[in-house]
Design a protein with these regions (language model features):
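Terminal helix-turn-helix DNA-binding modules in bacterial transcription factors
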Residues: 187-191, 196, 200-203, 219-264, ...
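A short, N-terminal "cap"/entry segment at the start of jelly-roll beta-barrel domains
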Residues: 1-14, 30
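N-terminal regulatory/effector-sensing and dimerization cores
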Residues: 15-112
Length: 281
């Protein structure tokens, strides 16, 4: 699967600290690999969006929008309503320099050494933000020089509003760079252990080649990825089956198996008994 690099791959001038794009498509995509070169607001207008990152994943509809820290992620875009022909999102890109300049200009206080925070933030629309997004749509139709001047004002307007309504957590997260590569790797694995991502997708989120990912995995977990993820899924299945009302037929697909028989066989190999026997004990 090709990797999309944003905003570089869009037909816009993106050398400035701020740029905008009215993204519309009639095609859905599933777990598209995306490299965000800048921090990005995705103001969803039509459709459904799901994003996987190294720290968290989220799913939104047109009632919400996302702030995503620059880096790598997987994106799923779906057209949800039958009367809609397109998926549509207004993308507002900004680099860290734009944010730092804003902080200095406005004397914004924030925690400089934050504890681990998400790399994706979700916000719900309100009346002010709905009007704000409409103004971005209008700006996106203007020529580049006019856009660049107006976006500086719109960026400050947006950040001021979000700080006053949401606090500064999102700013702290944007400015926090992960120092420990091992921590980053473990976060990717632990957060996605039940998400049924391929090794290629996981290595992408970990910012590694597939061969390096396998090597690092063996070093950290002393086993192969396939065996470790299998064990994690089966442990999760055992936890779910502690609820006597849960049947093996209810969970085998959630655990990542294509058939009930394969799930039962794998469960018996690990625990020595079938899922049904496990529940009876």
């Amino acid at each position: 699967m090709d990797i999309i690099t944003l905003p570089e791959d869009l037909s816009i001038q993106n050398e400035n600290a701020l740029c905008i794009y009215d993204y519309q498509t009639s095609k859905e995509c599933l777990k598209q690999m995306v490299t965000l070169q800048k921090n990005t607001f995705s103001f969803l207008i039509q459709g459904n969006k799901e994003v996987f990152s190294n720290k968290n994943n989220t799913n939104i509809n047109h009632n919400s929008f996302l702030l995503m820290k620059k880096g790598r992620c997987l994106m799923t875009e779906k057209i949800t309503l039958t009367e809609q022909k397109n998926y549509r999102s207004i993308l507002f890109f900004f680099d860290n320099e734009a944010l730092i300049n804003f902080i200095h200009k406005n004397n914004i206080s924030y925690v400089k050494s934050p504890v681990k925070k998400p790399s994706i933030f979700t916000f719900d629309y309100d009346g002010f933000l709905e009007v704000f997004v409409q103004s971005l749509i209008s700006i996106s139709k203007l020529n580049y020089k006019v856009q660049s001047k107006l976006l500086e004002t719109k960026f400050e307007e947006l950040i001021v509003y979000l700080i006053n309504t949401q606090g500064t957590d999102f700013i702290e997260s944007l400015l926090f760079e992960i120092q420990n590569e091992n921590q980053h790797f473990i976060e990717v694995i632990e957060h996605n252990k039940l998400n049924k991502l391929s090794l290629q997708e996981l290595s992408f989120l970990a910012n590694m080649s597939l061969s390096t990912f396998k090597r690092e995995f063996s070093k950290h977990f002393n086993t192969s990825p396939s065996k470790w993820f299998l064990d994690q899924r089966l442990e999760h299945a055992a936890l779910l089956l502690q609820d006597k009302s849960v049947r093996p037929t209810d969970i085998f697909e959630e655990i990542g198996y294509e058939s009930l028989s394969n799930f039962v066989q794998a469960f018996k190999i690990k625990f020595g008994i079938t899922p049904k026997q496990y529940q009876l004990n």
